[in-house]
Amino acid sequence: GVSTLAKLLNPKIKVIGVEPAGANCMQESLKTGEVVTLPQVNTIADGTAVKTPGSKIFPYIQENLDDIITVHDDELIVAFLDMVENHKMIVENSGLLTVAALKHLSVKDKRVVSILSGGNMDVITMSSVVQKGLILRDRIFTVSIQLPDKPGELCRVAGVVASVQANVIKLDHN
């Protein structure tokens, strides 16, 4: 629907579709020229995790789409973190496909519209996505060390952590 309206308003506009790499049924369908069913899908973008594209919309997509690209789940995770931290917006993973796709496109000095949609994400999923995003950005990591069992050793490690302006988020001591 969006591609049809965009082309109707401006026939010269370039419309680029985006799918998760783990659920790229439309991309595969466009390659073959007919609706393709994937054997399986694997993506965190659950709102677009379909094996088969809609047969009724397929002809419109063929007619109006200039290109289609895929993005990986890690890119969606980083896009989520960017939206939360930089724009104070919560957008579900499927709704972030266009944001993640921008990293693949040459958009400097161009007018670009990136459609964001949906905020249907429970707090457990949100927490997991934020955690993974921080790991992907090398902002948190796990360190496992073995210390002698004597007083002051943990304090010594804490001193090293503090000396590099870092924080301990969680500590497991066995």
What are these regions (language model features)?
Residues 1-3, 23-27, 94-102, 115, ...:
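Short glycine/serine/threonine-rich phosphate/pyrophosphate-binding segments
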Residues 41-44, 50-63, 132-147:
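Active-site pocket-lining segment
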